[in-house]
Amino acid sequence: MSSPKEPLSVVVAGGGTAGHIEPALAVAEALRDGYGATVTALGTARGLETSLVPDRGFDLRLIEPVPVPRTPNLDLVKLPFRVAKSLRQARQVLRDTGAHAVVGFGGYVSAPAYLAARSLGIPFFVHEANARAGMANKLGVRLGGVGLNATENSGMPGQVVGIPIRRELAGGEDATAAERGRTQWGLEADRPTVLVTGGSQGSVSINSAVAGALDDLLGAGIQVLHAVGKRNSLPTARPGYVPVPFIEDMQAAYAVADLIVCRSGAMTVAEVTASGIPAIYVPLPHGNGEQALNASAVIAAGAAKLVDDADLTPQRLVSEVRDIVGNPATLHRMSAAARTSTVGDAAGVIAGLVATAAGY
């Protein structure tokens, strides 16, 4: 009899923001649940992964981040030394875990992970969630990684697989999650609810617009669940207005929301669309313009609207929200458009590709 194989071991790399971490964890769960894999997450001490990864039951190993300066400065001079240190750390993690494969999702830890995997002869995959690929992921494919894209024309070679999202967010309406949300945030079931979030750090422009629009929104019978960001001061709660620093239970938040106002990071767009929630996207006005592109397909499908950051005044916010929430037919049409534009099980597809490449 042949001896049984050792369990599949995979390292996922995608630290920093939730947009990098959540797809990594979705794939980690698909590998664990579908293939019995041991999955280790690679991250840094400064990212959200320090809480998100352990909370989801995975081991987290830390390395030094390697941000690439966009302009010549002292950090650029230090870059080769930082890369060398992070590469050594990443190689050690791959050896310690006996990794059979690596999957990177962009961010500061991905480049060292790609370099380490190549140097050790370990197959590796590069997932790009944004409509425009980042530098670390482009490097990963050039190094021999298998490219996996969320959308066409990202500028990175590879097949289109969509964005991995948590299974519990892909099932649409969830009465249990909605009741949990109403209980923990004190929301009323018979009032329309607008969820507002600027991401884990919050958004000054979105927060300011909400502050100026609040009287009109509440006066129209709309209740607002507002994640202001961990670093921002918490506004005073009012009847119908629930400000919180950050929302851990996004399943419940999506379940109670009739409409969401948020940035259009790739992961956010994927989760919101899968949850069937009409959206008003306010793209981050920085970077290479990928946030506007991330939302372009769902906007074209009629599932969302876009408001430029510079145009987000309190008056514009009130107008857009009331146009959607105040019209049940519009809400229904946008929700249906969101559900029909959702991509399939990207996490399962990626897990299958990884397991096959590793010989499992």
From Swiss-Prot:
GO terms for biological process: carbohydrate metabolic process; cell division; cell wall organization; lipid glycosylation; peptidoglycan biosynthetic process; regulation of cell shape. It is found in: Cell membrane. It is a peripheral membrane protein. Cell wall formation. Catalyzes the transfer of a GlcNAc subunit on undecaprenyl-pyrophosphoryl-MurNAc-pentapeptide (lipid intermediate I) to form undecaprenyl-pyrophosphoryl-MurNAc-(pentapeptide)GlcNAc (lipid intermediate II). This is UDP-N-acetylglucosamine--N-acetylmuramyl-(pentapeptide) pyrophosphoryl-undecaprenol N-acetylglucosamine transferase. Belongs to the glycosyltransferase 28 family. MurG subfamily. GO terms for molecular function: UDP-N-acetyl-D-glucosamine:N-acetylmuramoyl-L-alanyl-D-glutamyl-meso-2,6-diaminopimelyl-D-alanyl-D-alanine-diphosphoundecaprenol 4-beta-N-acetylglucosaminlytransferase activity; undecaprenyldiphospho-muramoylpentapeptide beta-N-acetylglucosaminyltransferase activity. Gene3D superfamilies: Glycogen Phosphorylase B. Pathway: Cell wall biogenesis; peptidoglycan biosynthesis. Keywords: Cell cycle, Cell division, Cell membrane, Cell shape, Cell wall biogenesis/degradation, Glycosyltransferase, Membrane, Peptidoglycan synthesis, Transferase. Its main location: membrane. InterPro entries: GlcNAc_MurG, Glyco_trans_28_C, GlycoTrans_28_N. UDP-N-acetyl-alpha-D-glucosamine binds at residues 17-19, 130, 166, 200, 247, 291. It catalyses: di-trans,octa-cis-undecaprenyl diphospho-N-acetyl-alpha-D-muramoyl-L-alanyl-D-glutamyl-meso-2,6-diaminopimeloyl-D-alanyl-D-alanine + UDP-N-acetyl-alpha-D-glucosamine = di-trans,octa-cis-undecaprenyl diphospho-[N-acetyl-alpha-D-glucosaminyl-(1->4)]-N-acetyl-alpha-D-muramoyl-L-alanyl-D-glutamyl-meso-2,6-diaminopimeloyl-D-alanyl-D-alanine + UDP + H(+). It is an enzyme of class 2 (transferase). GO terms for cellular component: plasma membrane. The gene is murG.
